[in-house]
């Protein structure tokens, strides 16, 4: 058993836990409050803002229809559209292609690569994807995965199916591996503007002459070491110099710009390291911004995962309020419409720009981490998702947020990034006929959006500017980006995928998202195939965790930890319900020996023998308890542990020296054990099942809560 008393001289160990980065102003609080708000509540408000006059919707439909018909008239299934349509992610081959590319990126040795290729290729029906009048790009990608390089250049694909069988029998995995490498390079040319910034700038000239603008992105994943961060910083610095020279005074709106990823510039870009981030990352970002200001080019801060959003807003606020960066309209920020906080983030940025007499670039995108956000919320046991579960809800959010940006063009330069013709047409008509440079612009990804925006850019088209987001990087850095793009656009709901599918009518593609939502049985209803985190396991309730990126939850958790920081716990053995006296010793916090967590009383050998006898006597009465009632005991214990979780976290962190995430994981594991065994008992044990009897559990010190809870309840109900 454990009791507690207040220690008179213990040091408060949680005094500096999760201090707020900034005071929660009303606008910032609105962002936090909307983090995981119920989907229907968010969408109900947004659908009203995205509902347009009938005259406007008629114009939008006409423009969208014209764009789609023009696209389909010249569409031959080439490039990414052909690839994602050919290798649908619902097919075994499509999944194998993605898994293969993703896995090869992470496998350093050739033998393991070959073993993986052998395993994946043997299960893929690649022959069915060869020939059939499909485009060379699709065929080349297919052959690049399974045969030698020379066949990827074969134009006449008749008879290649039989040749494939012969070649795979003749050639080993290394040849296939080289084919995979070639296919990735081919696809890389489709998605990446150049391996170096100079190569990318040179390649961009032809489209710039036709009226397109560019924003360059130096490819790379999040930094894991200081050396990574320094390398990425040098890459950005070099790129800004090159882009600045190439801009030749064209300015922010007509000239090229750069996009930067904050997680690439600091290896600990997380809320838990906010003080380090503000002290170490902010000066780096400011230096890049100052260099961009010198050349008068735009610098966009790319959007990342939901748990980094508020930290990025603090960095943005510091940049906008910095007098050294005044008189420059090139600070940009990317906002993701699939996030429930998006409208409130825009309110904050608009207010920030107005208060500081600045004009800020805001790139509005649909969102890039949807599957990861859904999975993470479920795995972490959070109250709800930070993103919408239906694509149409994101489309509604995008339109509502676009209207907000267009209404603040005095302090905002809106940049609308979309490959969806219906969304594009909506923005075009929302913005109105009056246009001048700097009013707003469209944006698209290199290798994916040019066919659509060929119908937009130029006086003979819609006469609106489009900026191409242009990734720059080597073959090694492009694979992760490539896989993300193919996964993103291979989804069944993707416009890029659907426009290449002739079974999808034009009327479906130009449907007004607000009208679609209003026609649903329940407006804003969450997708019925995506369980909330609590319902992840179906019948068995998932344990609830803490959102360590939510400022309100951090503040509440901090107060609870501080209130229990001086608590001195006492652990005493019991035999047959009675406390046993014995010698006690202090338990110290392994991370701070001045913190006496409490005392523990050791049990003597004779008392252990008495405990075993008492347990033996209790077997008869416990065996009369039905499995259902035994399971109910475990459920009650789980609910109590969930309710007392914050206090347990403080104890575990002090006693075992665990970090907050590890402590949360341990308590959640204990709760899951209880509910799992309760559920299994109800499912598998009959009414006549007798208990296991006497058991003993020896647990490791490293898991003071979870291991005992894992072993003992299972024995109790078994």
Name these PLM-found stretches.
Residues 183-192, 196, 227, 242, ...:
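Pre-Walker A segment
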Residues 218, 303-305, 335-337, 364-366, ...:
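Active-site proximal loops enriched in glycine and acidic residues that flank catalytic Cys/His/Asp
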Residues 89, 102-107, 122-123, 618, ...:
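A short structural micro-motif
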Residues 461, 473, 477-480, 484-613, ...:
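Terminal low-complexity tails and localization/encapsulation signals of metabolic enzymes
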Residues 688-718:
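Substrate-binding/gating loop at the entrance of the active-site cleft, primarily
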Residues 2-544:
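Positively charged, amphipathic and often flexible ligand-engagement surfaces
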């Amino acid at each position: 058993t454990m009791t507690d008393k207040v220690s008179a001289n213990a040091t408060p160990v949680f005094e500096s836990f999760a201090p707020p980065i900034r005071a929660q102003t009303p606008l910032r609080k609105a962002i936090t409050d909307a983090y995981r708000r119920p989907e229907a509540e968010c969408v109900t408000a947004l659908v009203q803002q995205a509902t347009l006059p009938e005259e406007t919707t008629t114009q939008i439909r006409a423009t969208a229809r014209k764009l789609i018909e023009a696209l389909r008239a010249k569409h031959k299934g080439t490039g990414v559209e052909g690839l994602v349509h050919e290798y649908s992610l619902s097919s075994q081959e499509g999944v194998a292609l993605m898994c293969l590319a993703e896995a090869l990126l992470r496998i350093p040795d050739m033998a393991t690569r070959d073993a993986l290729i052998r395993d994946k290729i043997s299960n893929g029906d690649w022959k069915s994807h060869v020939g059939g009048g499909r485009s060379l790009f699709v065929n080349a990608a297919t052959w690049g995965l399974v045969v030698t390089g020379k066949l990827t250049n074969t134009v006449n694909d008749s008879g290649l199916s039989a040749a494939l069988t012969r070649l795979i029998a003749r050639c080993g995995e290394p040849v296939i591996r080289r084919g995979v490498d070639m296919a990735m390079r081919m696809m890389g040319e489709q998605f990446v503007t150049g391996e170096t910034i100079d190569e990318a700038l040179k390649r961009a000239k032809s489209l710039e002459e036709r009226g397109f603008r560019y924003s360059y992105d130096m490819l790379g994943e999040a930094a894991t070491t200081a050396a990574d961060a320094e390398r990425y910083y040098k890459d950005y610095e070099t790129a800004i110099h090159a882009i600045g020279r190439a801009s030749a005074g064209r300015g922010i709106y007509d000239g090229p710009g750069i996009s930067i990823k904050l997680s690439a510039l600091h290896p600990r870009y997380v809320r838990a390291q906010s003080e380090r981030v503000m002290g170490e990352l902010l000066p780096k970002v400011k230096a890049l911004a100052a260099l961009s200001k010198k050349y008068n080019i735009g610098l966009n801060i790319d959007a990342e995962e939901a748990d980094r959003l508020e930290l990025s807003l603090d960095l943005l606020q510091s940049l906008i309020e910095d007098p050294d960066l005044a008189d420059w309209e090139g600070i940009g920020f990317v906002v993701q419409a699939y996030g429930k906080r998006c409208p409130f983030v825009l309110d904050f940025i608009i207010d920030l720009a107005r208060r500081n007499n600045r004009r800020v670039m805001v790139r509005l995108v649909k969102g890039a981490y949807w599957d990861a956000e859904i999975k993470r919320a479920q795995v972490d046991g959070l109250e709800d998702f930070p993103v919408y579960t239906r694509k149409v809800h994101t489309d509604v959010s995008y339109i509502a947020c676009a209207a907000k940006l267009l209404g603040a063009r005095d302090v905002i330069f809106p940049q609308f990034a979309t490959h969806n013709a219906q969304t594009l047409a909506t923005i075009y008509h929302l913005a109105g006929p009056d246009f001048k440079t700097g009013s707003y612009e469209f944006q698209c990804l290199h290798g994916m959006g040019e066919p659509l925006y060929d119908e937009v850019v130029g006086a003979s088209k819609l006469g609106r500017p489009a900026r191409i987001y242009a990734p720059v990087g080597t073959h090694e850095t492009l694979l992760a980006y490539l896989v993300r793009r193919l996964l993103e656009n291979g989804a069944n709901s993707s416009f890029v995928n659907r426009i290449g599918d002739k079974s999808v009518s034009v009327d479906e593609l130009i449907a007004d998202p607000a009208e679609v939502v209003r026609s649903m049985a329940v407006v804003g209803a969450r997708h019925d195939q995506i369980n909330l985190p609590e319902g992840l396991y179906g019948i068995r309730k998932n344990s609830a965790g803490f959102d360590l990126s939510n400022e309100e939850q951090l503040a509440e958790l901090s107060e609870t930890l501080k209130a229990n920081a001086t608590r001195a716990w006492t652990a005493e053995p019991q035999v047959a319900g009675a406390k046993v006296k014995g010698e006690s010793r202090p338990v110290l916090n392994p991370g701070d020996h001045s913190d006496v967590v409490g005392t523990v009383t050791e049990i003597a050998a004779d008392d252990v023998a008495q405990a075993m006898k008492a347990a033996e006597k209790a077997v008869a009465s416990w065996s009369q308890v039905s499995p259902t009632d035994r399971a109910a005991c475990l459920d009650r214990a789980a609910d109590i542990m969930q309710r007392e979780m914050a206090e347990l976290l403080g104890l575990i962190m002090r006693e075992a020296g665990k970090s907050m995430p590890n402590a949360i994981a341990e308590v959640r594991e204990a709760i899951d054990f209880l509910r799992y065994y309760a559920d299994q008992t109800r499912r598998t044990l009959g009414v006549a099942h007798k208990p296991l009897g006497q058991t003993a559990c020896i647990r490791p010190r490293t898991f003071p809560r979870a291991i005992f809870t894992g072993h003992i309840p299972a024995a109790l109900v078994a």
